[in-house]
Structures are given as structure tokens and as C-alpha cells.
């Protein structure tokens, strides 16, 4: 496919996916994300041909022009839409599939691990039709499965299966294959705060058992069923918020 065909295809894709796009001419003239993607085609070709310094210099010029930083070594699929664009960073070994949507502030970066080296794959792979909300960070050599959605502000550090929605810091799955994923065990949410709360709860239970004759600390709820129902209602509210697009 020639460059003119790619430009025509990209403009048509943005016109269909962006409700703010009023005409093909407006998309062509006023879409910094598209400008960055089109420039990357040249930069990537130069990179593969061994003109790496030239490719890097040109990519820096485009970075100042569009606010989008795409390393010339990154591999981008067709019909990539970078909406708004400002602050998007795509690392050298990142791979982006077809029909992917990225919003402003998204980072496809490395973890900074000492095991990372110049010859290893350090950046994520996004499969086809992935949607990434603004200011989300996807870090390391991980894979985001096809048709998955990453919520705004999320930090993704592990693989995401296809057809999933992930939110949070670190990100956890809230939807999979169109079905809500119930988080009934706090151990399923892997983050330092949850670990600290779990350790604290275990410690309190141990101390109560050691005291023996002392009265256990009273709970706010009258019984476990009432407490469980209150937590379930709160989770339902959060899931409804996410299902309506909140945080995505």
C-alpha cells in the first residue's frame, strides 16, 4: 500500500472513530496524532535502512511539532489513531497492532529494570483494536490482548488477556468477554496498599486469638452477611461507573 493510500485510509478511520471530526480536510490539517504517525513511516524506514541518527533527529523535530514522541524503532500497525496526541510516548521496541486508539499522555515504555538492555524487547505489545485511555502507562515487555480497553490513569505491568477491561494502579481486570469480573478476594488485587491491609488484618486476627479472653474488636456491621452485602453494593456502583465509560 502506497503512502497516499495509507493517508486516505487513516483519514477515513479517524473520521469514523472521532465524533469531533467534521470533515476529511479538517482531519488532514488538524490532527497532530496523524501527523506524527505519518512522519513515523519515514523515520522507521530510515531506521531500518541504518540511517538511525537521521531518523532520531527527524523524530525529535516531529516531537516538538506534534507533542507526540514515537521512537523510529517502534512498529506501528495500520489505522492507529492518537487522539489529541500531546504527551504520548511510544518506546523503541513497542509493537502496536491495527485499529488501536491512544489518548493523550499514554506511555508505552520500559520498566527501567537493570535486566533491560539495548538488544532486548523492553516495551509492550498492543494487539489489534486496543483502546488506551488518557494518561495510562503500559510498561515492560507485556502484551495487551486484542479488543481490550485500558482505563484512564491506569498502570499496566502484567499481560492483559483479549476482550478485557483493566483499570487501577496497578491495573486489574474488571471486565472479561463482556462479563463483570468479581473481586471477592483482596489477594486478587496486587498492589502495596492491598498487601499492607491484608497483613494488618491478619495481624489483628492473630492478636485477638492470642489475647483469648479479651472481647474481639466490634465490627461496624451486625453480622457478616450485612458487611458482605455492603461491600457488594459498593462494588456494583464502581462496576456501573466503569461500564458507563467512567475512567476509560
Regions inferred by a protein language model and the residue ranges of each:
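Terminal amphipathic alpha-helical/low-complexity segments used for targeting or macromolecular assembly
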Residues: 1-61, 181-248
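A structural signal for small-residue-enriched, beta-sheet-centric alpha/beta enzyme cores
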Residues: 172, 176-183
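Solvent-exposed, flexible loop/coil residues
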Residues: 32-33, 38-41, 74, 80, ...
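Structural signal for interior beta-strand "rungs" in well-ordered beta-sheet cores
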Residues: 63-174
Amino acid at each position: 500500500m502506497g503512502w497516499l493510500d495509507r493517508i486516505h485510509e487513516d483519514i477515513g478511520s479517524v473520521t469514523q472513530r472521532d465524533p469531533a471530526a467534521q470533515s476529511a480536510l479538517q482531519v488532514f490539517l488538524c490532527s497532530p496524532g496523524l501527523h506524527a504517525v505519518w512522519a513515523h513511516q519515514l523515520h522507521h524506514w530510515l531506521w531500518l535502512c541504518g540511517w538511525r541518527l537521521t531518523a532520531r533527529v527527524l523524530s525529535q523535530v516531529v516531537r516538538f511539532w506534534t507533542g507526540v514522541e514515537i521512537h523510529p524503532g517502534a512498529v506501528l500497525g495500520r489505522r492507529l489513531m492518537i487522539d489529541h496526541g500531546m504527551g504520548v510516548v511510544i518506546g523503541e521496541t513497542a509493537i502496536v497492532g491495527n485499529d488501536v486508539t491512544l489518548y493523550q499522555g499514554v506511555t508505552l515504555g520500559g520498566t527501567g529494570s537493570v535486566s533491560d538492555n539495548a538488544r532486548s524487547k523492553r516495551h509492550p505489545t498492543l494487539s489489534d483494536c486496543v483502546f488506551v485511555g488518557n494518561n495510562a502507562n503500559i510498561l515492560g515487555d507485556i502484551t495487551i490482548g486484542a479488543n481490550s480497553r485500558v482505563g484512564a490513569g491506569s498502570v499496566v505491568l502484567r499481560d492483559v488477556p483479549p476482550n478485557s477491561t483493566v483499570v487501577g494502579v496497578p491495573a486489574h481486570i474488571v471486565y472479561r468477554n463482556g462479563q463483570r469480573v468479581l473481586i471477592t478476594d483482596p489477594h486478587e488485587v496486587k498492589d502495596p496498599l492491598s498487601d499492607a491491609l491484608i497483613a494488618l488484618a491478619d495481624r489483628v486476627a492473630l492478636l485477638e486469638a492470642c489475647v483469648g479472653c479479651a472481647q474481639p474488636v466490634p465490627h461496624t456491621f451486625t453480622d457478616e452477611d450485612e458487611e458482605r452485602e455492603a461491600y457488594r453494593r459498593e462494588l456494583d456502583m464502581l462496576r456501573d461507573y466503569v461500564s458507563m465509560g467512567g475512567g476509560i
